[in-house]
Amino acid sequence: KDASEADALKHALGAVLEGIAFYELAQVVSADTRVKVTFEDLGRRKAAQLAKLEALVGAQAKDSALYPSLYPLEAVSRAECYVCGYIVETKSMPNQCPKCGTARYTFEKEIALTKAWEIAAETSRKSADLFRESAGASHGRTRALLEELGKEDQALAAEAGKELAELRS
């Protein structure tokens, strides 16, 4: 693989890994069960994309991934207790607040289902563009896979748009 194809794969892997990280954290921090389920499903789709990429390049390639900052990770990486204001990392959210003793749910965020689908639509469009751009710098199986991932994310963006239209009607 030439350098441009290797870079294309690093960016594609980063986009998928960033998506997985975002959806996992968002699912943990969301208060609404419907939003949790939506983020869980979206995360599964990204995990399936990761499996396809790993089949091509190997699991160790994750170490060299370049994260493109497509997802609003900062919005879900920390959680604040709404009783006392104590802040924790979402990855290690405790079962109760270490400061005031309230239950875990005091760290959860009210994320509207429309917001979840807005994020899915926007990030899917951006990642579809990234996959297509990466495919342009690639050849053979790599190019075919990146084009496939681009189509998957374009379809997801369209699906998210339909979900949004339904929710808003």
Feature locations, PLM:
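Non-heme di-metal
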Residues: 1-169
